[in-house]
Amino acid sequence: MQFEWDEQKRKANIRKHGFDFRDAGKVFNSPMLVAPDNRYDYGEDRWIGIGMLEGRTVVVIFTERDDTIRIISIMKAMTYEKNKYEQHLRNQLGYD
């Protein structure tokens, strides 16, 4: 799996959210909950992924271009996103 990003957005994301796009692979190697990002018309299909990064629940906004995942943003998950992710994991494991 290959990743790409805009370098200026990566630096801005570190300043704003404290997460480096270079760590995106770790999130994609954990169980993820992925849904389409339909908040706006971006002119391309965007996805919202919730997963784990170094013990923290994070949200990754991304798009797929050919065989490459383009990272748009990584941020700490809000409480409702964390709860949704935890429920997804419980369902996957058959606990609910």
Give the predicted meaning of each segment.
Residues 1-96:
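Ribonuclease/tRNase effector modules and their secretory precursors
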